[in-house]
């Protein structure tokens, strides 16, 4: 676990991989608090207590850093979706599968509401070196839910083909509006959240 004392180590005290993790963690915290536009490589060096040269050994440029923070943001979303699944019903029934589908959709929207600055960066495409795959992957969590719905007969084979794009677009679009504060007050947003999730079920003819 990374703590503030961890982030104050000198260059020599960090193992190669540890420093990269610390830098991404610091970048993630910064974006969550201050937004994307103020993120910088030299600033991260100051926060983590290492030299700018050490930072540049891990990130060729700002685009590379932003890509890494974007990946970490997607992983925060993935963890929120998995946490929602842990709290959802576990029964291997149609109702259970639908409840789990709704729970991950709700978590996606909550990510936009509660972590709007991370939402802003999570799905931006940056010109950077290839990174390891996102894990946990929000897309894979959605796909697993849709496969379960299909196997239980809640989602037809025909609708399964377009279900990922439709479900993702509906929830992602609403989460984006919520992140910008465009869905009204807390009560109105909660009501609209329920509506969009129910609309996703209807659009995919899940029953």
Question: Which residue stretches match the model-derived regions?
Answer:
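N-terminal intrinsically disordered/low-complexity leader segments
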Residues: 1-18, 88
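Generic hydrophobic, amphipathic alpha-helix propensity
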Residues: 19-28, 44, 69-73, 77, ...
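Helix-turn-helix
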Residues: 22, 26, 30-64, 68
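Alpha-helical DNA-contacting segments of helix-turn-helix folds
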Residues: 31, 66-73, 80, 122, ...
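Hydrophobic alpha-helical connector segments
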Residues: 82-115, 167
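Amphipathic alpha-helical packing segments from all-alpha helical-bundle domains
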Residues: 95, 99, 110-111, 127-154, ...
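Amphipathic alpha-helical segments used for helix-helix packing
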Residues: 109-129, 176-184
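Amphipathic C-terminal alpha-helical segment
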Residues: 148, 168-186, 202-207
């Amino acid at each position: 676990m990374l703590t503030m004392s961890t982030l104050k180590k000198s260059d020599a005290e960090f193992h190669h991989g540890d420093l990269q993790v610390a830098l991404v963690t610091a970048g993630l915290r910064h974006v969550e608090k201050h937004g994307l536009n103020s993120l910088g490589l030299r600033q991260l060096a100051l926060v983590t207590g290492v030299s700018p040269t050490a930072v540049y050994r891990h990130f060729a440029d700002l685009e590379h850093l932003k890509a890494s923070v974007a990946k970490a943001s997607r992983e925060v979303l993935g963890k929120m979706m998995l946490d929602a699944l842990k709290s959802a019903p576990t029964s291997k029934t149609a109702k259970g599968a639908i409840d789990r589908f709704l729970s991950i959709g709700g978590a996606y929207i909550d990510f936009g509401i509660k972590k709007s600055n991370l939402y802003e960066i999570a799905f931006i495409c940056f010109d950077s070196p290839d990174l390891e795959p996102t894990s946990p992957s929000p897309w894979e969590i959605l796909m697993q839910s849709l496969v379960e719905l299909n196997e239980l007969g809640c989602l037809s084979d025909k609708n399964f083909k377009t279900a990922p794009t439709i479900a993702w677009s509906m929830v992602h679009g609403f989460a984006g509006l919520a992140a910008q504060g465009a869905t009204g007050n807390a009560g109105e947003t909660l009501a609209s959240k329920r509506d969009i999730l129910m609309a996703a079920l209807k659009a995919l003819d899940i029953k």
